[in-house]
Amino acid sequence: MDRFSGKTIIITGAGSGIGAAAARRFGQEGARVVLVGRTREKLDKVADDIPGAQVIAADVGTEDGVRAIVDGTIEAFGGIDVLVNNAGVAEPARMEDTERDAWDKTLRINLTGVYLMTQAAWPHLKKSGGNVVMTSSVSGMGGDWGMLAYNASKGGVSNFVKALALEADQSGVRVNAVAPSATVTDMASGLVENDTLYGKFKERIPLGRAADPEEVGDVIAFLASHDARFVNGVILPVDGGLSASNGQPPLG
């Protein structure tokens, strides 16, 4: 398939995990990919797998960083067709242990960064009739124990998607999100490498395992494609069925 031939796609948090997997999928389908992250070495490694990929090392949580990303993309390719807001951090802590610096960092990158990137890319997306895909989380659909800042940020992302999707009548820009659960990434290594904790997680996931990054990246590519042309304002769980449960334990 070449669903993205000639399309310019920005992916934040592209140095590893879901972002890197999505970037490779877009590259396989003919896209002109702009890889964004804070660590150039990681981005360069991903770029080796994607012909013609551009690398921009910048912080999406700052206005200067966002300006460099959007200006660099326009200079290289002349437009923006898809924005994938994937950058994110997580610093687990309960209320009494949540420090202000950790709270501010999480909200700045996970939520303010989404706003800044989307606002800066918006005129170009309107011009191209493009779309935005966010990486939210099942943690944006409900609460987790000891994940206050992350839950707040991802809940904000999910509602940002729904509110912005309502502007499609004037903008022509579709806005959607994926909501992964446990995924085999660097950020989730503390979960998937802890046999006891991961075992508890697998008991709650009907498909019995964490997702591979490629399984989430493939859904991002679907939402960004013409195949999803009438999909707007959706928070699509990619969680193996975790969110299908109402929380009750098995009764049989």
Where are these regions (language model features)?
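Conserved glycine-rich cofactor-binding loop
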Residues: 8, 15-17
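Short, small/polar-rich loop/turn modules that mediate ligand/substrate recognition or access, typified
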Residues: 84, 169, 174, 231-233
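Substrate-binding pocket helix/loop in short-chain dehydrogenase/reductase
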Residues: 94-95, 102-104, 201
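Active-site loop immediately N-terminal to the catalytic Tyr-X3-Lys motif
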Residues: 95-96, 142-148, 170-171, 208, ...
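Active-site helix of classical SDR
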Residues: 118, 153
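Alpha-helical segment proximal to the catalytic Tyr-Lys
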Residues: 123, 166-170, 229
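Residue(s) in the substrate-gating loop at a strand-loop-helix junction
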Residues: 137
